[in-house]
Structure formats: C-alpha cells, structure tokens
Amino acid sequence: MKTRTKNLISLVLLSSCLTAMVGCNTQGKGKVDKDNLVFDKNGIVLDNFEGLGVEWGTYEDPDKLSSGSWERSLKIMDRLNPQVTRCMLNYDWFITNFDDKFDSDKSNDTWEYNFSNKLMNNTIDVLRYCDDHNIDVAFGCWNVPGSLGKDEYNMFTEVTSDARWATMTADILEYLIKFQGIKCIKYFVNSNEPNYSGVEGKSKNYNNTFEVWAKGVKNVRKALDDRGFNDIKIIGGDTTGFEGTIEYFNGISKNDELKEAVGDYGFHVYCPNMIIDTGDLAVRIRDIYNQVKKNDKDLGVKRIPHIWEAGLYDGKNAETDSNAYIANYSYGLRMADYTLQCAIAGVNSIVYWDFDDGMHFMYNADGTMTSKGWGMFSSLSTDSAMKQRLRPWYHSSVLLTNLMRKGSKIIDNPANDPEVDNTFRSMAVVDENNTYAGVVAINRGMLPVTKTFRVAEEFLSNATTPNKIYVYIYNEADLNIGEDGFVKENQVLDLSLKDEIEISVPQNSMVILSSKEL
C-alpha cells in the first residue's frame, strides 16, 4: 500500500486551484498511464537543445518608431532573453553605382556599397546586441535585389543562382564580420521561402525551383569559404509549408554535395489551429524527420532541424500580412503548445515570428506602407497605446525562452501520444549541468485536469535550489504581471521536482513548474 504526504496549497488571488503531493508513486509498465507522468532518461528526445528565439530583423524605417522605443525594445528583449534570432535585410539598401556595361555579360558588372545609412546602422545595433548577449544569428536577405516591374539588376531569371548574388553576400558579410567585428552570425539564409514562387510581376521568386536554389547555395558556399567564412552555415531550405519543405528536404538529403554545403534543415511553419489543438503537429514533424533520416543519417548530428519562422495560420490577413488574433490569450497558449510539440518531435530550436510590429511593412501600390502585425508589441509612433502594450503571447514566450536554454535536455513521455490523449501535453526540460529542471504542462481541454509529475532524481543532481518550485500559470485569469510589466511566478513551493507533484491544470492553460525563477 502506497503512502503519501499531502500538502494542500492555497493560491492567493488565483481563480484556479493547485495542490501538491509528495510521494513514491511510479509510472506503470505496459498500458500508458496518462495521469502519473515520470520524466526519466528513457524519454530524452534532445540532449543539446539550441534554445528559443524571435525574429528581430532590421527595422525598415527607423524614423517611424516612437520616442524612446529603441531603449524600451531592448528592455523587452532583455526579459525575453532569447538564444537565437533571425535577422533579415535587403541588399538593395546598400548597392549603389551599379553598372552593367550595357551588355548581357553579367561577369563584368560592377557596383559599390553605401553602408553609411540608417538601415545599416540599425542592422549593426541589432547584431551588436546579439554579440553582447550571446545570441546566435541566422542572417540573410529576403530575396535578390531589384524592384518589381524593373529588375534593374537583371537577377529575377536566375534568382539566387546568379553568381553576383554570391559575391554580394560575401561582400556584405565581410563588411559586418571583418570591418564591424560582428561575431554572432552563425547561419546564412539563402533567400526567404524559396519554394514560394508566386507569379511574374508580383514576385521576384517566380522563376525559382529547387535546382536553381541548390545551385545558388553551392555558389554561396564557395564564396564564403573563399573569404574564410567556413564556419557560417547555410540554412538548408528556409522553406514554408509542409509540402514544399518535404520537397526541399528530400532534395537536400539525396544530394551529397548539397548536404555538405548546408548546415541544417530549416523551415517555416504557420500552423492551422486544428493541427496544433489535436496534437497532430508533433506527428507531422516526426513524419518529415523520418523521411529525411532515410537519406541523411547525419540529421540531428551534423545537420540539425530548426524552425526559423514560427506562427499561427488562423487569423492571417493576406492583404496586410498581419494576424487578427495576435493580441488574444489563445494565441499565446497555441504558440506554447506549438513549441512543446515541435520540441518533443526533435526540432532543435524555434524562432517566433516576430518581435515588433515596427520592423516590417507591406508596400502598397499607392506608395503607402502598412505595418505587418505579428509582433509581441508595437514600437510605431502611429500605433495606439493598446497596440504598444506587451501582448499576452510575449509573456508565455518569456517563460519558455528562459526555461528552454541552450544545451538543455528535452524529455518526452508516452502520454503525449494523441491516441492516448489529444488535449493534454507535457514535457520536462533539464539544463546541461543538471542544475535546474522544469515541467511544462498544457491543457487544451474544456475542463481542469489533475496530473502528477516527477522528474528523475538524476536530472537534479546539481540542483542549485533543490527544494523550490516556482509555479507559473498562463491563462487570462491567472497570468501574474509584476509592477515592472513582466511576468512573475504565481507561487513558490517548498518542494522538489524529484518528488511527486500533483496539480490541477486549469482548462485552456499552461502551467510551468520550475526549480529556478524564470
């Protein structure tokens, strides 16, 4: 007969009830126990997670920012504490004095660069922050230079396979790395979403194919190596959508030369709610992973899977490239669920789209600009005070980015199988030195559920606070925001994660139990 010591805990000012229970119950063998969850070495999916981050690119018009917004943005970034980011720009911003010699021979074209402008200054500000805060950067260009309807550089036919693209890439990276001393650039993005071709006159990418993109990757690889940038990896794809991603990943995995030219399998996922809500996202990611693994045994070793743009598809307005649900609590819960499912499926890092509404714009036919509303807040002076507030999904992201650090172990459990339960998911996160651990529990159901959690004692062998559990609850009623405007714990328990902890997880909520303050 099992014996337990029960501790009832009152959560002041919370609408939900949480209890803690210490005991010796263990997960049974055979049939999956979906109520008593143990995280041990058998559940390790990743043993060297690379961290979470957010898209933080060059601000396309810094003059539109509100007074003091840059300083505020840095404080917001400080609290988010990402370990990876993606920084994109346009080469058009810097190319000047282009001369094609009035002939069809591209090899004798000449051009210069003007790096003394506000766009390069802002780019360097972002990259220096990343240097100072040990943030790995995927740096790249949205697409080949040239404006729609003009193609003044004659690059739309060959796209990134044009040899001049590789030269421009190496030139700009050389300026940043050798002349500006930037050290954080670890990856190069060989154009954004190359599989999204579009149509001539409305897209620079209309003539792109996998073969064209692959040729461009090889050109860029040689150009970077010739400049001594052998350690900068090229993202293997940066594709969007499941179907297009599978095409590119299979193409890479079956081509030995191309496999050696790229440094990861990188893609974008804007996921429909239904796929996340039912737990099917993890299933789909694993399916892609297993397909690639058949051809590339180094998947997960030499070439790591990354998601470089993570967002939700439902609520997207194609005309404004914004999401109508971005300020809802449900957006934050789904993005947390998205993150958990990708992590337990083996994705090694995830970059959220995106940080600030003030970064990117839609350029309209009448010459006006419309900001893309996907951010965690807005720094635009023209936006209302409401839009400039931190959105709920910023706070849920803060909790995850501060728990899921570089080098962490991600630990799954059998109860996450959607056939067992498609409304509840959980994982454990343990840092590389076993100094802290955390459990993330997400209830997508319509009713509260009671679960018990235990993290194997071996994962807390060097715990700095072995008998403390910081409890964080994310939902509209219980999210706890401190006087500084940032999320804080709901309660601190004098317990250990190596003991059995029983909690009631409210409906449509995330609960995090962490042995360190997040």
Give the ranges of each region predicted by the language model.
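N-terminal carbohydrate-binding accessory modules
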Residues: 28-78
